């Protein structure tokens, strides 16, 4: 039997909506990364964008386990300005309580996707919103109940 390789015209993309309220960040991010790549489909082809479109709502209510929200020794995100000595840091707690809490989910998923042109295309299929409203009702997304999939997914 020959190995099956999907063609771009054969790929069917679905729209999913996931409620992130009281869901553990790492578990959600790993599942979303799998769905964005299309690895949950039997027709997965590594060099094509065969993943689905994912809408995540209630990103401001995401949960982190352990001491990651602790301001002193919690999860730290680093970035660099490009100038000598230009390393900047911020904590997960500051981001979640700030203006754009959806960035925590976007960063977690982005770091689980391949770092190339295909990964950038797959990340463009992810839509994260801080509250429960989203402008994608015309696509008729299917509700994906991630929290009830495993008791460890919810905190």
From Swiss-Prot:
Coiled coil: none annotated. The keyword Ribonucleoprotein applies. Keywords: Ribonucleoprotein, Ribosomal protein. The keyword Ribonucleoprotein applies. SUPFAM superfamilies: Ribosomal protein L13. One of its GO terms (biological process) is translation. It holds the Pfam family Ribosomal_L13. Part of the 50S ribosomal subunit. This protein is one of the early assembly proteins of the 50S ribosomal subunit, although it is not seen to bind rRNA by itself. It is important during the early stages of 50S assembly. This is Large ribosomal subunit protein uL13. It comes from Rickettsia prowazekii (strain Madrid E).
């Amino acid at each position: 039997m020959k190995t099956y390789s999907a063609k771009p015209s054969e790929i069917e993309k679905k729209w999913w909506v996931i409620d992130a309220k009281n869901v553990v960040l790492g578990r959600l991010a790993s599942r979303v990364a799998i769905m964005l790549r299309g690895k949950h489909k039997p027709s997965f082809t590594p060099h094509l964008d065969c993943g689905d479109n994912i809408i995540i709502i209630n990103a401001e209510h995401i949960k982190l386990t352990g001491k990651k929200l602790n301001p002193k020794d919690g999860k730290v995100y680093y970035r660099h300005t490009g100038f000598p000595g230009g390393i900047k840091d911020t904590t997960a707690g500051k981001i979640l309580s700030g203006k754009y809490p959806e960035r925590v989910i976007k960063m977690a998923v982005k770091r689980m996707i391949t770092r190339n042109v295909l990964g950038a295309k797959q990340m463009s299929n992810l839509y994260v919103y801080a509250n429960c409203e989203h402008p994608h009702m015309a696509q008729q997304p299917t509700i994906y109940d991630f929290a009830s999939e495993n008791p460890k997914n919810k905190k």
